[in-house]
Swiss-Prot record:
Function according to Swiss-Prot or TrEMBL: Catalyzes amidations at positions B, D, E, and G on adenosylcobyrinic A,C-diamide. NH(2) groups are provided by glutamine, and one molecule of ATP is hydrogenolyzed for each amidation.
Keywords: Cobalamin biosynthesis, Glutamine amidotransferase
Name of this chain's protein: Cobyric acid synthase
Domain GATase cobBQ-type: from-to ranges: 255-442
This protein's pathway: Cofactor biosynthesis; adenosylcobalamin biosynthesis
Transmembrane segments: none
C-alpha cells in the first residue's frame, strides 16, 4: 500500500502511441486549473527526446511538458528511469537524472529489481506534498512476456497501490478487441487494478459507439470513463518520440523550405516544432531512401544519440553529397548538438564511448574537431545569439568537446562562455544549444534573414493555449462523476 496520502491514478494503454502522454498532460492542466497541487510521474520512459529538469539531470521531454501542464517545477523524480536507445538493442540508462550505465535488452531485464527501488523512492518524493499524482505507463500491460520484474506498468501499479485507467485508441481500429483482449490476458491481480477505461481519438457521432461501450462492459465489467475526441490541440504540443515523428511529414506550405534529414538515432527533434508551427515555413523531414530537396533554403542537422554511427548512415544515404551540393548552391546549414559535431572535420572517440570506431571524418563544413569525453554536459542555459543579437533560452545535453578555428566565431554566448561555431561566410552554423528555435526573437531573426518578415507567434504561449484547450476538452468529454472523484 502507498504510504503517501496523495491521490494517484495511472493511465496505461492497450498499446504504444494511444495518447497517454497528452491525456496525462491534459488532466494535469485541468487539475492545476482547479487549484490542486498536481504532479506527473512516469516510472520508465524510452526516448531520445530528453529535457533538463529544473533540479538538474535528464528526464523525458514528455514529463517536462506534463510538469508545465501541471504548473509545477520539473524534477528528475518525475521520470526516474529514462532509457535512451543508442543501438538496435542497447540503451543508455538514466536513473533519477544521472547516467547509470548501458545495457542491452536481456541485461536490462536483470537490472529491473534494483531499479524498482529507485522508482518507488521517486514516486514517494513526487507524491509528498501533492494533492494528486497522475502516472503514465509505458507501452502496454498486456506484454506479459515482460511482466516479470516490470517497473513501467502493472509491476509499479501493484507495488505502489495505484489504480489504473486503461486507454484505448479507436482511431487505429480494433479498440474493442484491444480492451477485451487486455482483460483476457492479464493475471487476476493485475486485472483487479483496473478501475475503468477511456476511449481516445474518437471522430464522429459518439452515440454510434454506445453498443461498443455495452459490449466492453459485458466482456470486462469495466466502466467507461469517457470517450475523448481527436484533440486538435495536441498537434501544437512538442513531439514526444519517433513514433510521432513518422507521421510528421511536413509543416506548412510556406515560402521557406527547410529540410531535416531523419537520422536513425535522432534526438531532441522537438527542437524543430517551433519552425513547424510557422505558416510561412515548409518543414520537410527527409527519410531513408529520399534525397535532400534541391530547393531547400536551409538544412538542419538535428541532435543524435550516436554521432559517429549516424554520420556513417548519413553518408550511406548519399546525404553528404546532397549537402555539399546544397552548400555550393548557396544554401545554409544549421547543426544542433550531434548535428553540430558532424559538420566538423573529424570526430574522435579515443575511449570508445560510442562504440568501436575511434575516429571518423566529419562533413568538413566547419573547421572544427570534436573529441568525445565521458562526462556529460547537462544543464539549462541562458544565451544570446551572436548572429541576430537575440536572447536564447535552451538546454544542453551532450558528450564531447569541440574546438577549432571556426569556434573563434561563436554562434552564441551561453552563460558568459562561447558556444558553437560559424563558417567564415556565415552560412554554416553549429551549436550545442537545444531549444534555440523556441526562442521567439531568434526564430524571428533567422526567418527574417531569409526575407520572411511576418509577425512571429509566441511559441510558449501557443503551447500553453493548447494545454488549456485539451484540459477543456477532457472536462467536457470525461465522466463528470469520475472526474469529481479524481479531482475532489
Amino acid at each position: 500500500m502507498r504510504a503517501t496520502m496523495a491521490r494517484a491514478i495511472m493511465l496505461q494503454g492497450t498499446g504504444s502511441d494511444v495518447g497517454k502522454t497528452v491525456l496525462v498532460a491534459g488532466l494535469c492542466r485541468l487539475a492545476a486549473n482547479r487549484g490542486l497541487t498536481v504532479r506527473p510521474f512516469k516510472p520508465q520512459n524510452m526516448s531520445n527526446n530528453a529535457a533538463v529538469a529544473d533540479d538538474g539531470g535528464e528526464i523525458g521531454r514528455a514529463q517536462w511538458l506534463q510538469s508545465l501542464a501541471a504548473r509545477t517545477p520539473s524534477s528528475v523524480q518525475m521520470n526516474p528511469v529514462l532509457l535512451k536507445p543508442q543501438s538496435e538493442n542497447g540503451s543508455q540508462i538514466i536513473v533519477q537524472g544521472r547516467v547509470f550505465g548501458q545495457a542491452k535488452g536481456r541485461d536490462y531485464q536483470r537490472l529491473k529489481p534494483e531499479l524498482l527501488g529507485a522508482v518507488l523512492e521517486s514516486f514517494e518524493k513526487v507524491a509528498a506534498g501533492a494533492d494528486l499524482v497522475i502516472v503514465e505507463g509505458a507501452g502496454s500491460p498486456a506484454e506479459i512476456n515482460l511482466r516479470a520484474g516490470d517497473i513501467a506498468n502493472m509491476g509499479f501499479a501493484t507495488r505502489a497501490g495505484v489504480p489504473v485507467v486503461l486507454v484505448g485508441d479507436i482511431d487505429r481500429g480494433g479498440v474493442i478487441a484491444s480492451l477485451v483482449g487486455t482483460h483476457a490476458i492479464l493475471e487476476d491481480g493485475d486485472r483487479a487494478m483496473i478501475a475503468g477505461y477511456i476511449i481516445n481519438k474518437f471522430r464522429g457521432d459518439v452515440s454510434l459507439f454506445d453498443d461498443g461501450v455495452r459490449a466492453i462492459e459485458g466482456f470486462t465489467g469495466w466502466p467507461c470513463f469517457g470517450i475523448v475526441p481527436w484533440l486538435r490541440g495536441a498537434a501544437r504540443l512538442p513531439a514526444e518520440d519517433s513514433v510521432v515523428l513518422e507521421r510528421l511529414v511536413r509543416g506548412g506550405a510556406g515560402a521557406l523550405k527547410i529540410a531535416v534529414p531523419v537520422l536513425p538515432r535522432i534526438a531532441n527533434f522537438d527542437d524543430l516544432d517551433p519552425l513547424r508551427s510557422e505558416p510561412d515555413v515548409e518543414l520537410v523531414f527527409v527519410r531513408s531512401g529520399e534525397r535532400i530537396p534541391a530547393d531547400a533554403s536551409l538544412v538542419v542537422l538535428p541532435g543524435s544519440k550516436s554521432t559517429i554511427s549516424d554520420l556513417a548512415d548519413f553518408r550511406a544515404q548519399g546525404w553528404d553529397r546532397d549537402l555539399q551540393a546544397h552548400v555550393r548552391r548557396g544554401g545554409r546549414v544549421i547543426g544542433i548538438c550531434g548535428g553540430y559535431q558532424m559538420l566538423g572535420r573529424m570526430v574522435h572517440d579515443p575511449l570508445g564511448i560510442e562504440g568501436g570506431t575511434l575516429e571518423t571524418p566529419g562533413l568538413g563544413l566547419l573547421d572544427i574537431e570534436t573529441e568525445m569525453a565521458p562526462e556529460k554536459t547537462v544543464r539549462n542555459s541562458q544565451a544570446r545569439s551572436t548572429e541576430y543579437d537575440a536572447p536564447l533560452a535552451g538546454y544542453q545535453i551532450h558528450l564531447g568537446v569541440t574546438r577549432g578555428p571556426d569556434c573563434d566565431r561563436p554562434s552564441a554566448i551561453i552563460d558568459g562562455a562561447s558556444d558553437g561555431a560559424l563558417s567564415a561566410d556565415g552560412r554554416i552554423m553549429g551549436t550545442y544549444l537545444h531549444g534555440l528555435f523556441g526562442s521567439d526573437a531568434y526564430r524571428a531573426g533567422l526567418l527574417q534573414s531569409f526575407g520572411l518578415s511576418g509577425e512571429r507567434r509566441n511559441y510558449r504561449e501557443s503551447v500553453e493555449q493548447a494545454l488549456d484547450e485539451i484540459a477543456g476538452e477532457l472536462e467536457r468529454h470525461l465522466d463528470p462523476r469520475w472526474l469529481a472523484g479524481l479531482l475532489g
